[in-house]
């Protein structure tokens, strides 16, 4: 058990100053928690991880599949989603994909000793350029962006070029021009494009590393950029768009780490004998499937929500909450009762003490058959410990959050929101940000295998530092960078380009002609430039044409509908809160921030529909 000095230690204790008594005491919290976990004997299953069992081909295959590029491993070249994604990558990202495909191809050739698909068949590199596949950059680069590479093939089947990504420049950028200072974090360009000094092996020249270093006494306060297109949170995008965000994020994270000189490793998940019913040791997806039968729309396991609620009601002001363990025998008994009675609604929550609830909460996280941070991405989270500055660490974590499966991401967010509340009551509960991070870290970052103890000792302080970053910057981390949204827009546009087949072209043109004839009358009498039609099916007035100007915001439209429908059949107080969405065009669906400037959205996505409706829960 840690001393009172540890309880009062400041969250600003440095990770890089071992002589600091505060840091030593805080580390005592970490090892005390590890000891409690070992005494519980409930470490997660060892058989999930088979380190070193994946060869190069399997590693690359898993990466390409998760990046949405599995068709590059086999089959004929086409004009499908993978090719559309490739056409939108930056030069650095395309080079990273090429490296992965090349490695996969060479490994397969060695394994099978027979011809396999070569990387030049994917990236259309001429034979004369096999040694140096990157072609010279054209000096005529519009708006300062990298131009597309001009790719030629001797074959009659021509692959599309792999242009550098940039926002839809002919309309408007997703973010304002980057004016990054020590307290701002630019979302405009991919993070990998901002670490040129690292890529050239000059880490000391990196401005970000000079501005903020890990051994600074306090964490920096980053301000979220306020783009005219509005902030977009993860829950504001459609599932299909978030799936594409995941593809792009993995490619960008791998490129970003490569620029920083970090090898992105992956764990291999073996088949697990996970339970299909009950509470503890059940996969998140299974828990949610069972929960949604009782409570449709549940995004976080009900028992997890209930444990958090219990702690918030009774434990936030309790000294040593999370640190002081409950009775082992009591926790074991409560666990058994939860398994038997929770879903029958017969479990008595009044009998649960706050320290026991904290023990059950941590036990639930540890016993997930697949880690909350996911088995395949746990090494990438751990690798962020070796990044040189908090700014780059936050950027790495930002991309990793985008990569997490939805159940893991939602459950992690619920946990972090609770931990932030614990820290807010530090004066009462004596639990600083640093204390909380030290105690939570060994429950999130589980080390397994024969070298687990050594790895845990080496990564203890770094793991706790990452938890501290997750708690502190959670609002930023759950905001989708606008360079990713711009990339999705461009990907959606690339996916809608007409196919090259003449027969398919003729069919498409005929279909478009018929559709044009059907809508010709409405188009002639419809909206003029700068006017949008907003549909509001839940209002008495279900449609309204609105003239946009430079100051029109999403909140102005919702307010106007509320005013116009004030005397409708349902009063505003009875109606659920509604938000303005852009639907279709070059996005699946996006809920607009109330501060969004609509004329800018109109220019970026001129073919979208405008819909006023409640958020999906």
Which residue ranges define each predicted feature?
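Short, contiguous acidic and Ser/Thr-rich linear segments
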Residues: 540-556
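Eukaryotic basic, amphipathic alpha-helical target segments in cytosolic regions
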Residues: 288, 292, 308-316, 338-342, ...
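Intrinsically disordered regulatory linkers and targeting segments
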Residues: 1-350, 438, 442-521, 527, ...
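Eukaryotic mixed-charge, acidic/polar low-complexity intrinsically disordered regions
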Residues: 582-617
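Eukaryote-biased recognition of intrinsically disordered, low-complexity regulatory segments
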Residues: 521-545
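Conserved, well-structured core segments
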Residues: 301-303, 355-363, 414, 468-469, ...
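Alpha-helical bundle/repeat cores within regulatory domains of eukaryotic proteins
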Residues: 377-378, 390-464
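Interface signal in eukaryotic adaptor modules for cytoskeleton, membrane trafficking
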Residues: 315-404, 433-437, 575-593
